[in-house]
Amino acid sequence: MPYIEKLELKGFKSYGNKKVVIPFSKGFTAIVGANGSGKSNIGDAILFVLGGLSAKAMRASRISDLIFAGSKNEPPAKYAEVAIYFNNEDRGFPIDEDEVVIRRRVYPDGRSSYWLNGRRATRSEILDILTAAMISPDGYNIVLQGDITKFIKMSPLERRLLIDDISGIAEYDSKKEKALEELKQAEENLARVDLLIKEVKKQLDKLEKERNDALRYLDLKDKLEKAKVSLLLGEIKILETQIKEGEKRRAEIEEEIQKIEKEIEKIGKEIVEKVKVLREIEERIEKESGEEAIQITKKIGEVTSKIELTKRNIEVAKEELEDAQRRLAKTKEELRKVLSEIEKSKGAITRWKKRRDALINEIKKKEEERNVLVVKLGEIDKTFGAAREEFDSVVKELEETTRKMYEIEGNIRRLQEEKEKLHSRILFLRAKLPGIKEKINEFKAVVEDKRAEISEIEGKLSTIQAKRIKVEKEIEAKSNELEKVSKELESSERELIAAEAQREVRGNRAAEELKRSGIGGIYGTLAELIKVKDEAYALAIEVALGNRADNVVVEDELVAEKAIKYLKEHKLGRLTFLPLNKIKPKHVDSSVGLPAVDVIEYDQKIENAVKFALGDTVIVNSMEEARPHIGKVRMVTIEGELYERSGAITGGHFRARGLAVDTTKLREKVESLRRRKEALEGELNSLKIELRSLENASFELRIKLSDEKKELELASKDLNRLLEEENAVKEEIEESERKIQEIEQKIENEKSELAKLRGRIQRLERKKEKLKKALENPEARELMEKIRIIDGEISSLKEELSRIESRIESLESRLNEELLPRKASLEEEIEGLVNKINALKNNISENEKALELLNKELEKLKSIEENIKGEIRTLREKRKKLEEDISKLREKKEVLQRKLQELEIEANTLKVRDAQLNAQLEEKKYQLTHYDKNLIKSIKEIPLDLEKVKKEIEKMEEEIRSLEPVNMKAIEDFEIVERRYLELKSKREKLEAEKESIIEFINEIEKEKKNVFMRTFEAISRNFSEIFAKLSPGGSARLILENPEDPFSGGLEIEAKPAGKDVKRIEAMSGGEKALTALAFVFAIQKFKPAPFYLFDEIDAHLDDANVKRVADLIKESSKESQFIVITLRDVMMANADKIIGVSMRDGVSKVVSLSLEKAMKILEEIRKKQGWEHGN
């Protein structure tokens, strides 16, 4: 960051004509001097050289007043000049030099001159350089005398504008203003273009329809002509293709007819042979599927049932074996547990007996000890002894009774446990019973169902056998009848084919119908109306006429229209009519050959029609004679080769026409025979299907009958087993219930005995207590007490002994009555299970052997059955194959016969059709000559759908009529106006895009402007609060935006709370408080955005020493970042400075000198004394 190294003044204010150099420290420089010495003029000089324009700010009336006015010893200066030297080592100025010198001179007339590093410069150039280094003559970093509170006196808006300036958002406002100007211009341009577009669009809309109509008219004209040519070309191509295909097809038909006739004969022989073989196979099937096959099937069923029964026996035995093995393992495990319990019980009994013996010995010792005491006591009181003996007797009896009571309680517990076990077993068995009963019911139902099904199957088998015999007889009868009908139909179809062919050759049915319609003016077909003079030319004339032979000659076009209407109404097809009043005859050069019209006879009234059909044709003798004239004239040879004018040549075998025959009755007969044959075939096929169905059903029922009998046998066995199991469960439940009753009786007896014992114990206890009282002798009390203690011990030992004996008895009872018997029972059960397992294994083995024998027998029977079935299956397959072959052969024969008939009709029809097509082809080629050759050549693709082309032609002709009259000039006019319209539209789109871009740019500017401002404000606000707290310990202050949401619509308020005082608005503060607040604001800005230097003139004037000290400390700290030049009269401020400059006034001229701190202190002290200014004020 640059800083001021020195200041040079000459003729500036009070500094005289000589050059004065004022050096500054990089950090904190203090300027001191008496009032009026000229120290504040240094601040004015800095403001001046930086380009300041306000004379008032520099404490002058006008700018020329800054020139030295002279003194007693010096004349007035001719100009005032100030040079400021900046250190630029860090290149804060955008000048590549270590020092930047700015010089300004003002003349008496107010003119100013500027220099930059010795080079003349303009003020704006100087300001630009200063701005680049963040220096401004109007900056907040220059606070002249009395200006410190200007920050406080600012309006909220001015303070906010100061933040605007610090944040650098002015550039955003500049950009926005420029963008708004551009936006305004864009909107004006848009408005002008919109007016033009509107006007041009009116013209364009008007011209568009006229232009579209004109273009459509021209396009339709071209398309129409092209479509007509395309239609002709398409029709010609189709006709040529049809003629070629027809000739090829006729040759194929002749060859195919010969093949079919041979094939029909061959098939007839093959059918006869196959029918013979079929009858032989049916006889063998009947024989093979007789009684022997049924007996084998029955035996297989019986053996299969035995196998299933044996398998079931093995399965049951295995299940029982598995169950026995499981029970054996379970019983062995239980025996192991019982043996373990026995050992445990024996061990426990031994242990308890040892403890019992020990207790008996101990009781014995205690009783001996007690007897000694009793003897002593008896010596004291003889009566006491007798009482004591009775007491002891009662105690002994009480102990014995108590022991018995414990024994009975143990018995009751054991009996109850046994009872609970029996109850659990009964519950288990009762839960099992419903399942067994359910299965019994299921198997009963199965048995009944199986018996019913067996009966039903046997009935069905009888019915099927009867039906089968009946169907076989019907098949034989129908087969004989079918053979007879087929022969008759074949003969009739041959007759019909011949008749139909002759009729097709002879004439056109539709023409015949027309002649019988009663419409006047119909003469007949050309074939009927002409006669060949010489038979040698008959073939040539027939070929030359082609399809035109069937053209109908009529009086005029009205007759033709009536005939066409008749054909439509009666759906008789289509015919070509030759109206004599409209048809134009054709002519030919007779020098090439014999004109075709010369070899025929006809009525002169139909001459136009005859010459239309044959007038352009000549007859030549051979192909050699025709060759030189191909493509020049239409020719036909005597043998029937046809040469078209187009160059097309038609030739090959040609069948002449025969006489017509009436075929109505013959056709009816054929149709009747066909229907009968189809009916017989359908019936015969249905009967054969029914027979096969009956055979299959019979076989399936026999198999099912065998299966049902097996299932019945198995179900019956399962039912018997379940009934036995149900009885066993019921018997076990009854036995368990009987045992429970016995146990309950025992429990009741034991409880009764227990109640008696408890009553006896109560009586003995009362007697014992009474005897105790009798024994209470004061003289024997001590002995009695000892005896009582011993009695208590004996009693406790005896009670324990009683419990032990009861426990031993309980253990021995469980051992002898439960464990040992259970052991014997389990051993017996194990022996029984082992025997059962061995027996089951033997049973399984025997059954498996029997099963093996049965399987072998079944395999043998199945082999026999399979051989029979295989033979029958083979025969049936052969029969089926033969039936299918015969059916296919008959179908094939019928197809061939129909095909033969169709081919013969088709051959004759093709002959007639080809002649018609040739005539049509010549007509189309003639029509094509009316169109431009280039147009014809331009059509590369011939349409396929000619009907569609015809509809398009009609549609185009209709549209052309609707468009007339047409303004052709509208095409050119529209193009001119349209270009203008599109240019304007393009221009408008660009203008609209430009407008949107400007609006988007403005929005971005506003957004970024606010973000930059808020970041600046938040940082300065934070700094302000921190610095104010330092300058006024215990106080607080903050900056407040009037409108935080839209900061640019409001100002910036300052709210401060000096230490120990309430929050105050600026207006209510004292001078010192205002100064502190203002300084906090300045230093908050300095901390956020340090300026290169700060110039403060007597900012501490209203502060006490404590506040001055804090301000001075803050300046000292801030001088590490920026240069500070402070004009002051306070020693506290001066004491913190890095450099002190003294200013004095002599003879009206200010002098500058560098001072030490001591010297500066003395000068200040002298100034105070001289001016009566007390320290601290």
UniProtKB/Swiss-Prot annotation:
<dbReference type="GO" id="GO:0007062">
    <property type="term" value="P:sister chromatid cohesion"/>
</dbReference>
<dbReference type="GO" id="GO:0005694">
    <property type="term" value="C:chromosome"/>
</dbReference>
<comment type="similarity">
    <text>Belongs to the SMC family.</text>
</comment>
<keyword id="KW-0175">Coiled coil</keyword>
<dbReference type="InterPro" id="IPR036277">
    <property type="entry name" value="SMC_hinge_sf"/>
</dbReference>
<feature type="domain" description="SMC hinge">
    <location>
        <begin position="521"/>
        <end position="627"/>
    </location>
</feature>
<dbReference type="InterPro" id="IPR024704">
    <property type="entry name" value="SMC"/>
</dbReference>
<dbReference type="GO" id="GO:0007059">
    <property type="term" value="P:chromosome segregation"/>
</dbReference>
<comment type="subunit">
    <text>Homodimer.</text>
</comment>
<dbReference type="GO" id="GO:0030261">
    <property type="term" value="P:chromosome condensation"/>
</dbReference>
<protein>
    <recommendedName>
        <fullName>Chromosome partition protein Smc</fullName>
    </recommendedName>
</protein>
<feature type="coiled-coil region">
    <location>
        <begin position="167"/>
        <end position="506"/>
    </location>
</feature>
<dbReference type="GO" id="GO:0003677">
    <property type="term" value="F:DNA binding"/>
</dbReference>
<feature type="coiled-coil region">
    <location>
        <begin position="659"/>
        <end position="1012"/>
    </location>
</feature>
<dbReference type="Pfam" id="PF02463">
    <property type="entry name" value="SMC_N"/>
</dbReference>
<dbReference type="GO" id="GO:0006260">
    <property type="term" value="P:DNA replication"/>
</dbReference>
<dbReference type="InterPro" id="IPR003395">
    <property type="entry name" value="RecF/RecN/SMC_N"/>
</dbReference>
<dbReference type="InterPro" id="IPR027417">
    <property type="entry name" value="P-loop_NTPase"/>
</dbReference>
<keyword id="KW-0547">Nucleotide-binding</keyword>
<dbReference type="GO" id="GO:0005524">
    <property type="term" value="F:ATP binding"/>
</dbReference>
<dbReference type="InterPro" id="IPR010935">
    <property type="entry name" value="SMC_hinge"/>
</dbReference>
<dbReference type="Pfam" id="PF06470">
    <property type="entry name" value="SMC_hinge"/>
</dbReference>
<comment type="function">
    <text>Required for chromosome condensation and partitioning. Binds single-stranded but not double-stranded DNA.</text>
</comment>
<dbReference type="InterPro" id="IPR011890">
    <property type="entry name" value="SMC_prok"/>
</dbReference>
<dbReference type="GO" id="GO:0016887">
    <property type="term" value="F:ATP hydrolysis activity"/>
</dbReference>
<keyword id="KW-0963">Cytoplasm</keyword>
<dbReference type="GO" id="GO:0005737">
    <property type="term" value="C:cytoplasm"/>
</dbReference>
<keyword id="KW-0067">ATP-binding</keyword>
<keyword id="KW-0238">DNA-binding</keyword>
<feature type="binding site">
    <location>
        <begin position="34"/>
        <end position="41"/>
    </location>
    <ligand>
        <name>ATP</name>
    </ligand>
</feature>
